[in-house]
Amino acid sequence: MKTLVVYAHLLAACVSIGSLLLQDLALWRSRHRVLTQDEISALRNTANIVFMALVVLWVTGITLVTIGYFENPQEYFSNQKIWAKFSVVVILSLNGVLLHFYSFPKVVGNKAILELPSVDQKLIGCSGALSTVSWLFACYLGIARNWNYSLDYASIMLVYAGLVVTGFIVAHEVMRMARLDLPGLRINKGVDRDTV
């Protein structure tokens, strides 16, 4: 039973990260132009896949925590890594709401990403960086057995915060460098945005 739950948990994580990284790459390639209808459909499909995978991760994660507690009720919740992973997944989930209701409508709008106002570009870049860092760090916590009962919550979250800040800096610099060739934007004017 536990092995099957772990398998489903890992499979959902792999599907999510793979889908997100491929979609990020596709968005980067289209940064100078408006997305086509096919690209928007692919983005919507990816969002649905990641949402379903996140639901599976929550269900299997809670199941694994329950199993772990019954196996070792005296000490299981003293493992600070569990609370750190829970915190990261909560942040990841809340950021998913931001991506869905803020970033997504901006990305599929009638402007290329690099034509959006600077504040929108920064928020899209930062929310994307937070998503990638959070997914990868949550997965790392899942395999970091040497952190069990050895690192405290604050230390783990400090590492996470450092990675998030690094992700924000990288996202900012990537967007800044991408704007250097802004005059060469190729806008796809043949797409009717009212049908999106």
Language-model features and meaning:
Residues 1-196:
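Polytopic transmembrane helical bundles with strong interfacial aromatic enrichment
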